């Protein structure tokens, strides 16, 4: 059975934990393993932080949009902003690349997303924002119920 959730919140750093916990609570109905749940929470944290820090340049202006679809033990996750966009997506996806070294950003956000999820695609246009589509196939172990 297909199940969907959509949330929208102001692009403030303090809302990152709300996004992470909300997505994790929704996904918990599929009984993911602790590792799977931790990986998804980490990916949500990275993508939302990117939207807030880079997309909206930590201005507190704008919204972050998250949609989650669950179907047949597959998690489809979309995280979107309407911020400044990514001028060079190929460069941004390189490990350790950051546009904010003064904020001590590691430049590993996209690398983490790519390693923790089964599929990732990124659409971004200058001054139009960024949309990240992520997919994760969950095991069917019912690990959290045992």
From Swiss-Prot:
Keywords: ATP-binding, Kinase, Nucleotide-binding, Serine/threonine-protein kinase, Sporulation, Transferase. Signal peptide: none annotated. It is an enzyme of class 2 (transferase). It catalyses: L-seryl-[protein] + ATP = O-phospho-L-seryl-[protein] + ADP + H(+); L-threonyl-[protein] + ATP = O-phospho-L-threonyl-[protein] + ADP + H(+). Its EC number is 2.7.11.1. The keyword ATP-binding applies. The keyword Endoplasmic reticulum does not apply. Gene3D superfamilies: Histidine kinase-like ATPase, C-terminal domain. One of its GO terms (biological process) is sporulation resulting in formation of a cellular spore. One of its GO terms (molecular function) is protein serine kinase activity. PANTHER family: ANTI-SIGMA-F FACTOR RSBW, ANTI-SIGMA-F FACTOR RSBW-RELATED. Binds to sigma F and blocks its ability to form an RNA polymerase holoenzyme (E-sigma F). Phosphorylates SpoIIAA on a serine residue. This phosphorylation may enable SpoIIAA to act as an anti-anti-sigma factor that counteracts SpoIIAB and thus releases sigma F from inhibition. Belongs to the anti-sigma-factor family. This is Anti-sigma F factor. The lineage of its organism: Bacteria, Bacillati, Bacillota, Bacilli, Bacillales.
């Amino acid at each position: 059975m297909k199940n969907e959730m959509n949330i929208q919140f102001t692009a403030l750093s303090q809302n990152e934990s709300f996004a992470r916990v909300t997505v994790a609570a929704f996904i918990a109905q599929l009984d993911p393993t602790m590792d799977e749940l931790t990986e998804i929470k980490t990916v949500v944290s990275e993508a939302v932080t990117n939207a807030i820090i880079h997309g909206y340049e930590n201005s507190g202006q704008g919204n972050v949009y998250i949609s989650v679809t669950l179907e047949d033990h597959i998690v489809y996750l979309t995280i979107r902003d309407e911020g400044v966009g990514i001028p060079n997506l190929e460069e941004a996806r390189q490990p350790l690349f950051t546009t904010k070294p003064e904020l001590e950003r590691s430049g590993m956000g996209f690398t983490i997303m790519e390693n923790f999820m089964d599929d990732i695609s990124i659409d971004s246009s200058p001054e139009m924002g960024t949309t990240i589509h992520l997919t994760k196939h969950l095991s069917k172990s019912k690990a959290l119920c045992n």
